[in-house]
Amino acid sequence: MLYLIYGVDKAGEEGRALRAAMREAHFTYLEEHARIIVLGGATLTDRPDDTRTGSVLIVNVASRAEADAFANNEPFHKAGLFARYTVTRMRRGQWNPAGAPKTAEGD
Protein backbone atom coordinates (compact mmCIF):
# COMPACT_ATOMS: atom_id res chain seq x y z
CA MET A 1 0.00 0.00 0.00
CA LEU A 2 1.14 3.51 -0.74
CA TYR A 3 1.13 6.22 1.90
CA LEU A 4 1.87 9.92 1.51
CA ILE A 5 3.66 11.39 4.52
CA TYR A 6 3.60 15.18 4.63
CA GLY A 7 5.11 17.43 7.26
CA VAL A 8 5.04 21.23 7.40
CA ASP A 9 7.98 22.72 9.32
CA LYS A 10 7.51 24.97 12.30
CA ALA A 11 8.07 28.55 11.19
CA GLY A 12 11.09 30.70 11.88
CA GLU A 13 14.33 29.97 13.62
CA GLU A 14 12.93 27.05 15.64
CA GLY A 15 12.09 25.11 12.48
CA ARG A 16 15.37 25.96 10.76
CA ALA A 17 17.38 24.94 13.83
CA LEU A 18 15.55 21.61 14.23
CA ARG A 19 15.94 20.81 10.52
CA ALA A 20 19.67 21.56 10.63
CA ALA A 21 20.21 19.60 13.85
CA MET A 22 18.40 16.49 12.60
CA ARG A 23 19.48 16.53 8.95
CA GLU A 24 22.13 13.81 9.23
CA ALA A 25 19.88 11.53 11.31
CA HIS A 26 17.04 12.11 8.82
CA PHE A 27 19.16 11.04 5.84
CA THR A 28 20.56 8.03 7.72
CA TYR A 29 17.00 6.94 8.54
CA LEU A 30 15.97 7.28 4.89
CA GLU A 31 18.97 5.21 3.77
CA GLU A 32 18.06 2.51 6.31
CA HIS A 33 14.52 2.38 4.88
CA ALA A 34 15.35 2.88 1.19
CA ARG A 35 13.54 -0.34 0.22
CA ILE A 36 10.13 1.19 1.09
CA ILE A 37 10.66 4.76 -0.16
CA VAL A 38 9.10 5.48 -3.54
CA LEU A 39 9.79 9.21 -3.55
CA GLY A 40 10.88 11.82 -1.08
CA GLY A 41 11.95 15.41 -0.90
CA ALA A 42 11.69 18.76 0.78
CA THR A 43 9.02 21.32 0.02
CA LEU A 44 10.48 24.74 -0.80
CA THR A 45 9.59 28.40 -0.94
CA ASP A 46 9.56 30.13 -4.32
CA ARG A 47 12.32 32.47 -3.17
CA PRO A 48 15.77 32.16 -4.76
CA ASP A 49 17.24 30.71 -1.54
CA ASP A 50 15.02 27.59 -1.78
CA THR A 51 14.21 27.68 1.94
CA ARG A 52 12.81 24.33 3.04
CA THR A 53 9.25 24.45 4.38
CA GLY A 54 8.52 20.78 4.96
CA SER A 55 8.97 17.20 3.80
CA VAL A 56 7.10 14.76 1.57
CA LEU A 57 7.63 11.02 1.43
CA ILE A 58 5.72 8.33 -0.43
CA VAL A 59 6.28 4.87 1.03
CA ASN A 60 5.21 1.42 -0.15
CA VAL A 61 4.41 -0.75 2.87
CA ALA A 62 2.17 -3.68 3.78
CA SER A 63 -0.09 -1.90 6.28
CA ARG A 64 -1.18 1.34 7.90
CA ALA A 65 0.61 0.22 11.05
CA GLU A 66 3.90 -0.05 9.14
CA ALA A 67 3.38 3.41 7.59
CA ASP A 68 2.65 4.90 11.01
CA ALA A 69 5.66 3.20 12.58
CA PHE A 70 7.95 4.52 9.85
CA ALA A 71 6.49 8.02 10.13
CA ASN A 72 6.53 8.12 13.94
CA ASN A 73 10.19 7.11 14.06
CA GLU A 74 11.39 9.52 11.37
CA PRO A 75 13.97 11.82 13.05
CA PHE A 76 12.48 15.15 11.90
CA HIS A 77 9.10 14.10 13.28
CA LYS A 78 10.52 12.70 16.53
CA ALA A 79 12.45 15.94 17.11
CA GLY A 80 9.27 18.01 16.81
CA LEU A 81 10.18 19.80 13.56
CA PHE A 82 6.69 19.73 12.09
CA ALA A 83 3.82 22.08 12.91
CA ARG A 84 1.51 19.76 10.94
CA TYR A 85 2.08 16.12 9.98
CA THR A 86 -0.16 13.72 8.09
CA VAL A 87 0.01 10.11 6.93
CA THR A 88 -2.54 9.41 4.20
CA ARG A 89 -3.16 6.27 2.18
CA MET A 90 -3.08 6.89 -1.55
CA ARG A 91 -3.48 5.13 -4.86
CA ARG A 92 -1.04 5.54 -7.70
CA GLY A 93 -2.70 7.17 -10.69
CA GLN A 94 -0.48 8.57 -13.37
CA TRP A 95 3.07 7.30 -13.33
CA ASN A 96 5.61 8.80 -15.69
CA PRO A 97 9.21 8.07 -14.68
CA ALA A 98 10.38 9.66 -17.95
CA GLY A 99 8.86 12.95 -16.76
CA ALA A 100 10.97 13.00 -13.60
CA PRO A 101 13.62 15.72 -13.47
CA LYS A 102 17.25 14.76 -14.02
CA THR A 103 18.39 16.76 -10.97
CA ALA A 104 17.11 17.20 -7.43
CA GLU A 105 16.07 20.79 -8.20
CA GLY A 106 14.33 20.00 -11.50
CA ASP A 107 15.27 20.58 -15.11
Where in the sequence are the language-model features?
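Conserved, structured core segments of small domains
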Residues: 1-107
